[in-house]
Amino acid sequence: MKQNSNIPKITMTTNGYRLNKIAKQLYNYGLDGINISIDSLNRETFKKLTGHDRLPEILEGIKILQDLNFKNIKVNAVLLKDINDTHEDFEKFGNFIKNNEIDFRFIELMQTGDNLDYFKRYHVSATKFTNYLNKNNWVIQTFGRDAGPAKNYLNPKFKGKFGVIAPYSKDFCKSCNRLRITAKGDLRLCLFGNTGISIRHLLQKDDQTEELQDLIMGQMKFKKESHYLELGETGLTKNLSTTGG
């Protein structure tokens, strides 16, 4: 894809399944970054959450990428009440990144159109994790204009970084620089917005680029300053699996 287009950077989001089998291929094909979902480093807890016992394979895949000097590795975990939100859990993830150049990010559980019961049961504020960071000498990192929604924290004793994505925090949307495209080809100005417009018809040919750009720029004036998740308004998003970053 990179060889035949003007796309300068390609990253991949994955649950890590078969990563130990394809890590070398991904590296050789020129992948620039990888985001891997690991909600727990406890093997039994991981198995209960995912329904499979593949944590060792996923960690092996990460090790293979590191041995290849692959730098841009991010690990994401959804912060879940009574599952991975204890001091011991935070310490375990800290030990994981202490000697590894890995960005580990906790994502605050978000309500969507179809997960209200799950959200009520497992949501816990991201401040529980940020309080831990502040008490343990982690310092927030200044971020550039092209940075994502995570606030990153550094500690001189650790090679890796901690990050937090806290959509319910004050001014979370203030620095938003994201648009979303669903699997069906709909442009969403906000992950939790109430409107969307199809751009699928403009993704068919190379000579449609200018028309596509004009459409997107025209839609930008409708981008709102904030979502309304704190009011329980989840917009068009029924579940996050249909929407890309």
Label the predicted regions:
Residues 1-107:
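Radical SAM/AdoMet-radical enzyme domain recognition
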Residues 92-99, 109-245:
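Auxiliary Fe-S-binding modules of radical SAM enzymes
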